[in-house]
Amino acid sequence: MTSSDFQLRGVGDPRLAVHATSPLPAWLWSIDGTRVLWANAVGARFFGAANAAALAQKTFGPADSHRRQVAQLARRLPAGGAIRLERLRGFGAALGTLMTCACARLEFADGGHAVLVTAMNATGRIMPLVERLHRLVEGAVVPMAAFAPDGLFIGASEAARPLLGFRDLGDRKSVV
C-alpha cells in the first residue's frame, strides 16, 4: 500500500478515523516496526515530523527502541484487532518511564497487517483542535480539506486546492 492509501485510510477506516483528530498520539506501524504507515498530528509531532506524510517517509533503524517494541508487539498481539493495553517505553512517556498504550494488530482487506499504538495519556502541551485539523490535511497527496466543528474552513491539501477554487491559502479568505 502507498502512503496516500494510508492517508485516506486514516480518515476512512473507522478503526483509525476515531484517532485522526484525537489529542492523544496514535500511530499505525508496519509489522516489522521500520515505518509509521499513518499517524495523527500529535503522533507525528512526537517524532518531530510536521505531519503524517513526513513521518511516513522516515525509516526506523534496527537499534530504535520503538521499532523493536512494535516488532515484538506484532508477534504477540492476536490477529483480528482485539485491543490490549501494553506498557511501552517512549511513545510519549517521560524518560525512563512507561506509557500505557492501547495496541491492536489490524488486518486490512488487501491482506496486509499493521500495529495500531495509541497512547492513553497526554504529555506536554495539548495541541489545539485547529492545529490538529490543519496538520491532518497538510502534506496529503490526495484531495483533503478540514473544517472546524462550527464549519470554519481550516485548510486543504495541495491536491484539494484546485477543487476548492483557489490557488493558495491566501485566496481562501474570499471563501470563508
Give the role of each language-model region.
Residues 21-24, 32, 139-140:
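C-terminal helix caps at helix-to-loop junctions of PAS-family sensory domains
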Residues 32, 149-150:
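Short loop/turn segments that connect beta-strands within the blades of beta-propeller domains
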Residues 2, 10-11:
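Long, solvent-exposed non-transmembrane regions
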Residues 26-28, 36, 143-146:
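Short hydrophobic secondary-structure edge segments in sensory/regulatory modules of signaling proteins
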Residues 15-19, 133-139:
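PAS-family sensory domains
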Residues 3-6, 29-129, 159-176:
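Sensory/regulatory domains in signal-transduction proteins
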